[in-house]
Amino acid sequence: MSVHIEAKQGEIAESILLPGDPLRAKYIAETFLEDVTCYNNVRGMLGFTGTYKGKRVSVQGTGMGVPSISIYVNELIQSYGVKNLIRVGTCGAIQKDVKVRDVIIAMTACTDSNMNRLTFPGFDFAPAANFDLLKKAYDAGTEKGLHVRVGNVLTADVFYRESMDIVKKLGDYGVLAVEMETTALYTLAAKYGVNALSVLTVSDHIFTGEETTSEERQTTFNEMIEIALDAAIQQ
């Protein structure tokens, strides 16, 4: 048991999916996994373990933003020995040719968070995905005939931003989309020597206004989830 996770040792698999929304964790467990058990309900942040295609896998809600995901990733790695962590979530497109419902696999993440600047004063640490996980996820997506993009994303600390000028400039430099957690996940994975990946579905476009409903975000992004699960069970 850790501070925010009440699981006993052995109840969490070495490979885990990390949705921000605990209701999405429940949806993934009920829709994709077999022989499911719920190991966590602390603060309503649900966690489940089951099997997918005969392989053991867990799914844990993390909440939104760098501080929240950092809590769960730290505890999953240090207290429960998790080795493969795959964030599954939504993002807002920045590039004109990135469309709603496209799948983005984050190769790396830039950020306006001070998390890494506190650890590396005067430096900008460049957190990156694990290549093996990335390739497996990319191959799984292309085999399904999906439009999968691989590249840089922005991990933002601010959801309601007063000006989008900096986001537009990052788009000019090739950043694909904006979300709120990947930098933290990749940095902590690097710190502890484990594998991490973010697989994201585009829920809206920052500049065109195209978007999906909140219900669709919870229940219909099955392709993203399948890609992540297929990558997880190959590790």
Curated annotation (Swiss-Prot):
The record marks R217 as: Important for catalytic activity. GO terms for biological process: purine nucleoside catabolic process. Phosphate binds at G20, R24, R43, R87, V88, G89, T90. It catalyses: a purine D-ribonucleoside + phosphate = a purine nucleobase + alpha-D-ribose 1-phosphate; a purine 2'-deoxy-D-ribonucleoside + phosphate = a purine nucleobase + 2-deoxy-alpha-D-ribose 1-phosphate. It is an enzyme of class 2 (transferase). The keyword Glycosyltransferase applies. Keywords: Glycosyltransferase, Transferase. It holds the Pfam family PNP_UDP_1. Its EC number is 2.4.2.1. The active site is at D204 (proton donor). It comes from the Bacteria. InterPro entries: DeoD-type, Nucleoside_phosphorylase_CS, Nucleoside_phosphorylase_d, Nucleoside_phosphorylase_sf. A purine D-ribonucleoside binds at H4, E162, E179, M180, E181, S203, D204. One of its GO terms (molecular function) is purine-nucleoside phosphorylase activity. Catalyzes the reversible phosphorolytic breakdown of the N-glycosidic bond in the beta-(deoxy)ribonucleoside molecules, with the formation of the corresponding free purine bases and pentose-1-phosphate. PANTHER family: FI09636P-RELATED (PTHR43691:SF11), URIDINE PHOSPHORYLASE (PTHR43691). This is Purine nucleoside phosphorylase DeoD-type. It comes from Bacillus cereus (strain ATCC 14579 / DSM 31 / CCUG 7414 / JCM 2152 / NBRC 15305 / NCIMB 9373 / NCTC 2599 / NRRL B-3711). The lineage of its organism: Bacteria, Bacillati, Bacillota, Bacilli, Bacillales.
